[in-house]
Design a protein with these regions (language model features):
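Catalytic phosphate/metal-binding cores of nucleic-acid and nucleotide-processing enzymes, i.e., regions
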Residues: 1-126
Length: 126
């Protein structure tokens, strides 16, 4: 749990440095919905839901479902492990780039193959 919290702090620090708005969501508690991504982020008008996992963490079926629903809705649902943090940073840099448009996002097919864990099927991201 400490490893995931340290990773979360690293991700939040990076997002703050990029000028992204984000909130930490504590799901599964009283009056909260389970399966919602850990971080709900807005970068340059783009919605990004980030489910953080430590190196050996495994997402629940509900977390996977919710990430896929975010992607189907036109947002970015991301299952993020520490070893993919550099690719995540590249995505956020693209989203926060002042002249980013659909063309620059569609040019990043690299992410689909190299960014996402095979446990999550993500369609129409890049």
């Amino acid at each position: 749990m400490a490893a995931e919290k340290n990773f979360e702090n690293k991700v939040k620090k990076f997002l703050k440095e990029q000028g992204c708005y984000f909130i930490k969501y504590w799901g599964g508690g009283a009056f909260t919905k389970s399966g919602v991504p850990d971080l709900l982020v807005c970068c340059n008008g783009y919605f990004v839901g980030v489910e953080l996992k430590a190196e050996n963490g495994k997402p629940s079926e509900l977390q996977i479902h919710n990430l896929n629903e975010i992607n189907k809705s036109g947002g970015y649902g991301i299952l993020l492990y520490p070893e993919k943090f550099n690719q995540f940073k590249q995505l956020i840099w693209l989203l926060t780039y002042p002249f980013c448009n659909d063309e620059c996002l569609n040019a990043t097919d690299y992410f689909q193959e190299n960014f996402y864990n095979q446990q999550v099927i993500i369609n129409d991201i890049f």
